[in-house]
Swiss-Prot record:
Pfam families: Ribosomal_S8 (PF00410)
Protein name (Swiss-Prot/TrEMBL): Small ribosomal subunit protein uS8c
Higher taxonomy: Eukaryota, Rhodophyta, Bangiophyceae, Cyanidiales, Cyanidiaceae
GO molecular function: rRNA binding; structural constituent of ribosome
Alphabetized InterPro entries for the sequence: Ribosomal_uS8, Ribosomal_uS8_CS, Ribosomal_uS8_sf
Listed GO biological process terms: translation
Family according to the record: Belongs to the universal ribosomal protein uS8 family.
Matches recorded under PANTHER family: 40S RIBOSOMAL PROTEIN S15A
Length: 117
């Protein structure tokens, strides 16, 4: 299991167990995805801690979070063919990690990492 999948699973499980904090593996991709979630108001804060990231969750903000592009099957999309979803998609583009709405505004496509609502 890759670190992004681990992070999403830990957030999902902590949210269901009503935990306030969760420790996830530290990586640059996890940090960038966590920053996007924080900017969108889905998590309260992210703090680096040794080899982990400490994420403070907001109660009942994330209803569902899932991995789209996996190591065995990468999913890419241009900004013109971005799928319509309930909630938002997090995209890794050449301009950085961002939501699918921001990618459409900037007219860049990329790898669809995960979805959240």
């Amino acid at each position: 299991m890759d670190t992004l999948s681990q992070m999403l699973t830990k957030i999902r499980n902590a949210q269901m167990a009503r935990h306030r904090w969760v420790l996830v593996p530290a990586s640059r991709m996890n940090w960038n995805v966590a920053q996007v979630l924080r900017e969108e108001g889905l998590i309260a804060q992210v703090q680096p801690a040794d080899l982990h990231l400490r994420i403070q969750l907001k109660p009942k903000r994330i209803q569902r979070i899932w991995r789209v592009s996996k190591p065995g099957l990468r999913i890419y999309s241009s900004y013109k063919n971005m799928p319509k979803v309930l909630g938002m998609l997090i995209i890794s583009t050449s301009k950085g990690v961002m939501t699918h709405q921001k990618a459409k505004q900037m007219q860049v496509g990329g790898e669809i990492l995960c979805g959240v609502y």
